[in-house]
Curated annotation (Swiss-Prot):
Annotated catalysed reactions: AMP + diphosphate = 5-phospho-alpha-D-ribose 1-diphosphate + adenine
E.C. number: 2.4.2.7
Key word Kinase present: no
This protein's UniProt keywords: Cytoplasm, Glycosyltransferase, Purine salvage, Transferase
CDD domains registered for this protein in UniProt: PRTases_typeI (cd06223)
Pfam families in the cross-refs: Pribosyltran (PF00156)
Gene Ontology CC entries for this record: cytoplasm
The family this protein is said to belong to: Belongs to the purine/pyrimidine phosphoribosyltransferase family.
NCBIfam families found in the cross-reference section: PRK02304.1-3 (NF002634), PRK02304.1-5 (NF002636)
Biochemical pathway: Purine metabolism; AMP biosynthesis via salvage pathway; AMP from adenine: step 1/1
Protein name from the UniProt record: Adenine phosphoribosyltransferase
Organism: Clavibacter michiganensis subsp. michiganensis (strain NCPPB 382)
Assembly and interaction partners: Homodimer.
GO MF, any single term: adenine binding
Length: 175
């Protein structure tokens, strides 16, 4: 992906924290990007423009919520929350996905949009792709079309894009 003003801003603001949350992990901290108004605007504008018209924007808990709300506002559409299991009351759709040690689950309220609605799915980082793959399945099970998947940062060595084959994936910055 060619460099853009958004990718330049992300690269300049991204923090790298060694040994967090445990020894041997090189954590990429995007909070400075989200805290910078021009950077956030550039990121959201690029993610929205890459997808085309949508009916809603879904965000994966937790930082995906921030991106989804901003993108939905910029697009004049609503937002959907893909939550960690046990956080939504009432009827939910649930998808489990593998973690390095064990598994996790995410949930979505069904029936929030008309069947066939186009939804842009956003999260902060694409690593192994497990969470976004599960989130895309949730949206499809709810009867929606995943119009695109957008992230601020893709960690290419972890192979997440391959797990999302068949989806249009846009990363602002790939490392």
């Amino acid at each position: 992906m060619p460099e853009t003003p958004a990718s330049d801003l992300v690269r300049s603001l991204l923090l790298t924290v060694p040994d967090f949350p445990q020894p041997g992990i090189l954590f990429r901290d995007l909070t400075p990007v989200l805290a910078d108004g021009p950077a956030l605007r550039a990121v959201v504008d690029d993610l929205v423009a890459a997808c085309g018209p949508v009916d809603a924007v879904a965000g994966v808990e937790a930082r995906g919520f921030l991106l989804a709300a901003a993108a939905a506002y910029a697009s004049g559409v609503g937002t959907l929350a893909v939550r960690k299991a046990g956080k939504l009351p009432g009827e939910v759709l649930r998808e489990t996905y593998a973690l390095e040690y064990g598994e996790a689950a995410i949930e979505l309220h069904p029936g929030q949009l008309a069947p066939g609605s186009r939804v842009l799915l956003l999260d902060d980082v694409l690593a192994t792709g497990g969470t976004l793959e599960a989130a895309a399945r949730l949206l499809e099970r709810a009867g929606y079309e995943v119009a695109g998947i957008g992230v601020v940062l893709e960690l290419a060595d972890l192979g997440g894009r391959e797990r999302l084959a068949g989806h249009d994936v846009r990363a602002i910055l790939t490392l």
